[in-house]
Amino acid sequence: MKIAITGCGIGGLAIANLLADTDHEITLYDQFDTPAPVGSGLVIQPVGLRVLEKMGAAEDALAYGAAGYQMLGHESHTGRKVLDVSYGPNGGNSFGLGIHRASLFEALLNASQRKGVSITTASRVTGTTLLNRKHTLDLTGKTAGPFDLVIDASGAKSPLSPMTAKPLPYGAIWGTVDWPETTSLSYSRLQQRYRRASNMIGILPIGTLPNDNSPKAALFWSMPRNDFTLWENTPIDEWRKGAIGLWSELAPFVEQIQSHSQMTHARYSHGTLRKPYSQGLVHIGDAAHRASPQLGQGANMALLDAYALAHCLKHYALEQALAEYHKSRKRHVKIYQAMSWMFTPMYQSDSRILPILRDWLLAPSSTVPPAPKILTSLVKGTMVSPHRGIDI
């Protein structure tokens, strides 16, 4: 088959890589002149790492990233611990990999280029035209095709996805900072501080960047999505003062932010395509399902989608392959979307009641067996099988 993949992000590179050893003719289209990542830090969970291993990208990713063995969160005023999820003992084989998007992108791109993946740059996809069961890609000023299959990995702003996602009231700003030698914070933990659910600040160790061997961290600050413009027009020192007031130990990190341009806005939405495919067109990653990053599953969902789709295309004829792909991922996506919808307002919302329930009901109950194991499996992405009927 002739297959077009739109979007050179995590999902696009992953599916191109996983199909590179087939007889299909694969072309990956990207809108930028040079493929490049967008964003700051993220966490690759153990299930995502297994996909990277299948792709031949895990070694580079592990060399760049930072192994995280615990997620820890405290209420800022009382110091009460309200989030504690452990992957396993420090130094063990079970961990989440904190990594910068640029580093993950480099690992994925290198692995894909080793397999001969072809990337067509400066090609902005605006739509498709279906004729005689084949798709022609509509590009800016030109067309490409026809293709037997178009894989939409264009992300949350995909022009090919019919999804209508609901904007979430809270987003965040993210920035990359150096890890200070003077800090007492652990480089093996994602740590957060909350003031009710309306303020959250956190620090995620993310390892090193391409061509920069100094240890880095992703600094993030939660805020209402409608406050972004107000924040940009407020002196940066006022924000720094408020951030340090929320968590004084982060002063060496926060003080590195000297201008608004060092922080990237992230706006989140929530939605899922009931059927992520149609005749000769299939959606993966954020083009198929979107949620808050509170559970740390965004990149993993794209990797898991890519693995399932590649498996099905290798074992079934096209129409059945798309149906089997949807079947294999449906339950996992549905449950994690529901969990994200339920938990996110406890950490990012204007509610006064939900953070009280979080601090005084959910946090204590989360320490009673079997709750710790359930929370760990939730974060790892394995609370239910990521691929129904498919081994990984």
Question: What is the role of each PLM region?
Answer:
Residues 109-110, 114-263:
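Conserved FAD-binding catalytic core of PHBH/FMO-like flavoproteins
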Residues 11, 34, 157:
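Conserved Rossmann-like nucleotide-cofactor binding loop
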Residues 28-29, 150, 194, 284:
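Generic enzyme active-site microenvironment
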Residues 1-9:
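Beta1/beta-strand and adjacent pyrophosphate-binding region of the FAD-binding site
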Residues 2, 25, 216:
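Residues at the starts of beta-strands that form the adenosine-phosphate
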Residues 40, 44-111:
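Active-site-adjacent segment of FAD-dependent monooxygenases/related oxidoreductases
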Residues 8-21, 29, 173, 262-352, ...:
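Conserved mid-domain beta->alpha element of the FAD-binding
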Residues 20-40:
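Glycine-rich FAD pyrophosphate-binding loop
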